[in-house]
């Protein structure tokens, strides 16, 4: 959309409320905020008559409020939402084959430990995620290679000095506000990263194995 002028309301999708909406081809993807609603796929080939085709639920205590899709591949986050719910579900990033949108098929899941993944960017191959990770305070930056979506591979990570307490770093903030990566966004060889109360960082990712603040 180049301009919002003359925009007309042509249809409405009654859903459980969304944390993110994404469109790929004729499919609209809705990531819901609250369980048990997880991710809904809607056929919008006729924009005046959108048709829900399936919903992927999540158990109590978890949500999947973010979704991205490209070329028959959908990725959704799994993140703790509240205190009650099965711990074995696990936080992370779930990867689906959606070549048949009516029957999404989970092909893998990247488990992060802790609360899971909050937000992310996806360019069709690499996912730039904000997960919790063992040994770290808060959420960090992580880059996953999904060229083989059944076997995601971590290729790089970055964090604010002090987050890696498991590696011997000293957590220096006395206000106890955890440094949490909120959302990495890629533009060329740069990753623009919001970090909640700790500001924003620009990372050089020309070498994805060694993200570097600039």
Regions found by a protein language model. Name each.
Residues 1-214:
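Feature marking well-ordered beta-strand scaffolds used for ligand recognition
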């Amino acid at each position: 959309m180049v301009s919002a002028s003359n925009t007309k309301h042509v249809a409405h999708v009654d859903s459980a409320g969304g944390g993110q909406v994404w469109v790929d081809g004729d499919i609209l993807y809705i990531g819901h905020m609250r369980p048990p609603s997880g991710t809904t796929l809607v056929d919008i080939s006729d924009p005046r008559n959108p048709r829900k085709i399936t919903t992927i639920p999540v158990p109590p205590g978890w949500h999947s409020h973010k979704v991205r899709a490209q070329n028959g591949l959908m990725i959704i986050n799994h993140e703790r939402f509240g205190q009650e719910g099965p711990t074995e579900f696990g936080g992370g990033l779930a990867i689906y084959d959606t070549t048949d949108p009516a029957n999404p098929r989970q092909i893998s899941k990247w488990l992060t430990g802790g609360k899971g993944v909050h937000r992310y960017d996806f360019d069709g191959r690499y996912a730039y995620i904000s997960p919790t990770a063992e040994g770290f305070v808060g959420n960090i930056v992580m880059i996953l290679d999904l060229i083989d979506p059944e076997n995601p591979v971590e290729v790089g990570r970055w964090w604010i000095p002090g987050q890696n307490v498991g590696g011997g770093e000293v957590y220096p903030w006395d206000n106890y506000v955890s440094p949490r990566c909120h959302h990495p966004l890629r533009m060329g060889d740069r990753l623009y990263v919001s970090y909640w109360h700790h500001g924003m960082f620009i990372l050089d990712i020309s070498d994805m194995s060694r993200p570097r603040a600039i």
